[in-house]
Structure formats: C-alpha cells, structure tokens
C-alpha cells in the first residue's frame, strides 16, 4: 500500500509524462514524411491540453485527452492504405484498432486504451457527447480544421453555436476568428479622455495644470 502511494505521489506523474512524450514521438514517426498530418495532430493536442487545463480537468482525464488528441487521426493512414479514402467515418472505423496497437506497445493501461479507442471512434460524431475529454477533443479538432479547411466565418459561427460547450473553447474561437468583437475603436483613448474632461467640466472640478 505504501509503495502504491509513493507511486501516486511521485514517479506516477513522471511516468505519465514520459509515456505521453513517447506516444508523441511514435505518432511523428507513424506519419513520417507527412508534415501536414503531423502538424494537424500537434495542433489538436496543444489546444486540447490548453482547453483541458483551463477547464480544470483532473489528471486522469487529462492523460486520456492528451493520448486521444495525439492519435485521433491515426485511422487516416489505414483508410488510405485500405480503401484510398480517409473521410470521417472511415477514420472512426479504422482508427481504434490502430490506436490500441500503438498504445498497448507503449504500455498504456487497458482502461485508458478503451477510452481512447472510444474517442478515436467517435471524434467525428457530434451528438451524445459524453465527457469533457470527448467535448474538448472535438472542439480542438474543429479549431484546427476551421483554419486548415479555410471555412468562412458564417460556417464557423453556426458550428460553434451547435457544438462548442466549454468557455475556453468559445473564447479561443472568438479571439482567433472574430477579433472585431473585441477590438476597441481606433480613437477609444481620445474618446475616453474627452468623456473625462466633459465630466470634470460638468462637475466644476478644478485641476491644477
């Protein structure tokens, strides 16, 4: 019991990080020579981690989320090799087995593998989303795809309204694609100063020059 507690308090965190890093490198090798797909999962992983941390995910859920984000598109390669296509449904059908093989080889626990399989097998399914890991993975994938697919703002807005649930994900969308919502006018400083001067004059306040 004491040994188990020591593992939980100390080396467990280090072991988790090392395993995620090994999975990261394994996925880069898996897609060697294909920078497009490597950079896609790198961005999805980074945004998933950011949203997960900002939303306060616990350590175990974050672990699953990071692993799933790294391998979420692993089925693309299998689909292309088998059928010459890599649409969302093909990814969901072929991805889980490929993810299981890689995660098993790297020593991931069975419960983690099962959840990652589920997420990989549903990451293009946007109804009945169960769990923050699932929700965040979908949001991160959308954020990256919005840019990579060159979607117009109207399509982005509609899908965000239907799919996005986390406050962090929504904020990133707004800052990334709708900055005009937050930009102040070019003369905001002058306008604010004029308002202050008008107020001072109305109140009859004397300010020494």
For the regions a protein language model found, what residue spans apply to each?
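Acidic/histidine metal-binding catalytic segments
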Residues: 57-64, 106-120, 133
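A generic alpha-helix surface/boundary motif
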Residues: 21, 45-46, 96-98, 114
């Amino acid at each position: 019991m004491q040994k188990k507690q020591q593992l939980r308090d100390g080396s467990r965190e280090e072991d988790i990080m090392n395993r995620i890093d090994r999975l990261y490198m394994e996925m880069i090798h898996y897609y060697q020579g294909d920078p497009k797909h490597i950079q896609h999962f790198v961005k999805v992983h980074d945004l998933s981690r950011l949203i997960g941390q900002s939303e306060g995910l616990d350590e175990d859920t974050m672990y699953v989320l990071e692993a799933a984000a790294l391998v979420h598109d692993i089925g693309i390669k299998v689909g292309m090799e088998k059928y010459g296509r890599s649409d969302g449904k093909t990814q969901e059908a072929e991805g889980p087995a490929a993810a299981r093989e890689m995660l098993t080889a790297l020593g991931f626990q069975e419960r983690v593998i099962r959840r990652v399989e589920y997420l990989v097998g549903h990451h293009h399914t946007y109804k009945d989303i169960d769990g923050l890991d699932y929700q965040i993975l979908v949001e991160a994938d959308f954020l990256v795809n919005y840019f990579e697919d060159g979607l117009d703002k109207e399509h982005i807005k509609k899908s965000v309204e239907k799919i996005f649930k986390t406050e962090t994900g929504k904020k990133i969308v707004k800052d990334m694609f709708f900055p005009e919502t937050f930009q102040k006018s070019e003369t905001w400083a002058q306008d604010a100063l004029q308002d202050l001067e008008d107020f001072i004059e109305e109140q009859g306040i004397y300010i020494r020059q």
